[in-house]
Amino acid sequence: DKYQLTLKEMYAQKGWSRESVYRFVAETYRACRPDVVVTQDVNGEYGHGAHRAAADAAQAAIALAADEKYQEKMTHSEPWQVKKLYLHLYEQNPVKMDWRKPLAAFGGQTAFDLASRAFECHISQQRTDYHVEDFGPYDNSKFGLAYSAVGEDVQKDDFFENLE
């Protein structure tokens, strides 16, 4: 994670074609049928190339997954329309999540508690200065609605707003 790659360099270094990555993500959308997708910052937070590629592919794959004409290269042939896409740190249509609210479904633990525990399992990150934080330049509670098929958010604190 110490290295910084442009989006073009990331695809080239891994030997990935954008088309194959977009197709893979579009197939994943069709297979899993998410209403909401939440992903990385388009600038890779601190410049992380894989984060940039994730955000790039997440955006491009929405149209492909929904396109009935985009069948010949897809394993999952039923089109799927993702309803909303949120990007971390995206400045348009901002949303601020409250990760400190206790969740009854998780015995009163907060989303922040769970994220912190999950981050501890990300072994390669334990040798870095990165932490789970809901403040500062990489505030993990800040997102923006980059795409919506169901209208803009009004409450600005709920990824599932406007979904039935």
Predicted regions and their residues:
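Active-site beta-strand->loop->alpha-helix modules in alpha/beta enzyme cores, enriched
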Residues: D1-Q71
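The feature marks non-catalytic terminal segments
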Residues: L64-E164
